[in-house]
C-alpha cells in the first residue's frame, strides 16, 4: 500500500522540480502503477494545474503535455491521421477505457517499462522529450538513461514524410503484450523498426533503403536482420526463443504492409 504524508498541487514547474529533489517525494501521474507500490511518500506532487494536459498541433509538429491521458491520445484526430491509425492501434489494447482515462503520457514515458506500448509507438517517430532542467533530448536517448529527478514536461513529435504501422501479440485482448512492434517507412525507403516487451525495454533498429528488390524479399531481409540482432528474454508470457521468432514475424508483416500502402499511394 502507498501512504502519502503530504499533498502539494504545484503552481510552477520550478516548484514541482524543487519538491521532487527530495528522495521521499513523488510526482503523480495517473496513479496507475504508483499506487500499487508499497512505499511511504513524503510529498505527492500534482502537476495537474500546470496546463500540461493538452495536445497542440502545428504545421510541423505535435506537442503532447505530460498530463495528457492515453485516452486523449487515442481520440486525437490529428495523430490518427498522421500515423494512419497506429496511435489508436497501440493504445486500444491497454486494459480498458477507464484506465486509459487515468494513465498519462508522462507517466508512461517516464516509467520506461519494458512492456510499454506507448514507448514502443513513439520511438518509431521523430520524437523528443522536454525535461524541465535537462532540455530537449531524443526519446531514444531518454529511454536509455537511468531514472532521475527531473520533470518530464512534454513530448515533441516532429512531422515527417513517413508511414506508420503498429502491432502487438497478446495472450488475451487486454493483457500486457508478449511482444510489440512499431514500424515507420520514411520517404527515402528506409525503415525504423521498434521492438518492445522483449520483455526488456523497447529497442530501435534503423534499416537502410534497398533498391531493386521486391517487397517480399525486402521484408524477409529486414526480418532476418532484426532476428539476428535482437536480444530477448523469458517470463511467464513467453520465452526468449518465441519472442525472437515473433520479432521476425512482426517485422516482416510491418514491412509488407507499409510497402503495399506506399505502392497503392503511388498508383
Regions flagged by a language model, labelled:
Residues 1-267:
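C-terminal structural segment of proteins
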Amino acid at each position: 500500500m502507498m501512504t502519502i504524508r503530504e499533498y502539494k498541487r504545484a503552481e510552477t514547474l520550478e516548484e514541482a522540480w524543487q519538491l521532487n529533489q527530495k528522495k521521499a517525494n513523488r510526482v503523480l501521474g495517473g496513479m496507475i502503477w504508483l499506487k500499487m507500490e508499497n512505499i511511504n511518500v513524503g510529498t505527492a506532487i500534482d502537476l495537474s494545474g500546470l496546463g500540461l494536459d493538452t495536445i497542440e498541433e502545428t504545421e510541423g509538429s505535435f506537442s503532447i503535455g505530460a498530463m495528457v491521458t492515453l485516452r486523449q491520445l487515442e481520440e486525437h484526430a490529428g495523430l490518427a491521421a498522421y500515423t494512419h491509425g497506429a496511435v489508436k492501434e497501440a493504445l486500444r489494447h491497454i486494459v480498458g477505457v477507464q484506465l486509459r482515462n487515468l494513465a498519462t503520457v508522462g507517466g508512461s514515458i517516464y516509467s520506461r517499462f519494458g512492456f510499454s506500448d506507448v514507448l514502443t509507438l513513439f520511438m518509431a517517430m521523430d520524437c523528443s522529450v522536454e525535461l524541465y532542467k535537462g532540455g530537449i533530448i531524443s526519446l531514444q536517448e531518454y529511454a536509455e538513461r537511468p531514472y532521475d529527478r527531473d520533470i518530464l514536461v512534454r513530448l515533441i513529435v516532429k512531422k515527417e514524410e513517413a508511414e506508420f504501422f503498429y502491432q502487438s501479440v497478446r495472450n488475451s485482448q487486454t493483457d500486457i503484450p508478449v511482444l510489440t512492434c512499431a514500424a515507420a517507412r520514411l520517404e527515402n525507403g528506409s525503415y525504423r523498426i521498434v521492438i518492445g516487451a522483449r520483455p526488456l525495454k523497447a529497442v530501435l533498429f534503423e534499416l537502410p533503403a534497398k533498391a531493386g528488390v521486391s517487397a517480399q524479399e525486402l521484408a524477409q531481409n529486414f526480418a532476418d536482420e532484426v532476428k539476428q540482432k535482437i536480444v530477448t528474454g523469458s517470463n511467464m508470457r513467453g520465452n526468449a526463443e518465441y519472442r525472437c521468432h515473433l520479432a521476425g514475424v512482426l517485422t516482416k508483416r510491418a514491412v509488407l504492409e507499409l510497402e503495399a500502402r506506399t505502392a497503392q499511394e503511388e498508383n
